Amino acid sequence: MEQIKTFILMTFLALIFMFFGGLIGGEQGVIIAFVVALGMNFFSYFFSDKLVLKHYHAVKVDENSAGGLYAIVRRLANAANVPMPSVYIIPEQIPNAFATGRNPNNAAVAVTEGLLNLLSENEIEGVLAHEMSHVRHYDILIGSVAAVFAGAIAILANFAKFGAVFGGNENNRQNGILMIVAAIIMPIAAAIIQMAISRSREYKADAGAANLTKHPEWLISALSKLENYAQNRTMQNATPQSAHMFIINPFSGVKSSFSQLFRTHPSTKDRIARLNEIKQSM
């Protein structure tokens, strides 16, 4: 079922890419966008995880270099009945975490140094249980594919702005308004896609974490600390295109009506409320 969802997502994003390619370059733009979309689908499926990990300078660790962290991930992988994922630490002092990969057999979980310094061992386990739930539910591929396409859509939007401003011939000038509209709409379309993908899967992963650890309060405490920290600081190298992958939106501290309207995560208050309901039912 999750593979079907991923296929639908990749097809939908390719169609959006082709539509805006047509607005910018007519029939030739559609053809170019189609070829690029095919290449991006292939690239996203096999390499999106590596791209995201490289962007955040994630360092792979093992049981010798990070024994405690590795042991927690191994324990959760066994509980979730999934293969042991690769484990990475991001040299970043803002606490956060994400999972990536195309399937449970090729998964990776990454945490920042700041998260390891801020949270207790139980809270770290709650966060990692959340990420392992993403792995088990195949959310990781969908999130990685969406991140790559959102980045490409942002690039296409910049091309549209360039074409609208610097188009030299009469036809380009006549299409200038369409290009400007495309440049405005494309990032919004990318944000809506990320929002639709992320909000429901975060609730699902929170519930999965509670089920894996049998201690919802671990994740409740972790989310509260992470949210409080994120309100005052923003991650270095964080991009809006990959924000939906993190357990807490790295741009939580950015206060604007636009960012609130298109936020990629449900509110931490609502997530904690749902976890408290799960706790009471245990």
Swiss-Prot record:
Spell out the protein name for this chain: Protease HtpX homolog
Q: Which residues form the active site?
A: E131
The protein's superkingdom reads: Bacteria
EC number of the protein: 3.4.24.-
One short Pfam name that applies is Peptidase_M48
Give the record's cofactor note, including how many are bound.
Answer: Binds 1 zinc ion per subunit.
Instruction: Give the transmembrane region(s).
Output: 6-26, 28-48, 140-160, 177-197
Q: Which gene encodes it?
A: htpX
Q: What class of enzyme is it?
A: hydrolase
GO BP terms, alphabetized: proteolysis
A Gene Ontology CC term for this entry? plasma membrane
> Any idea where this protein resides?
Cell inner membrane
Q: Which family does it belong to?
A: Belongs to the peptidase M48B family.
Q: Which PANTHER family match?
A: PROTEASE HTPX
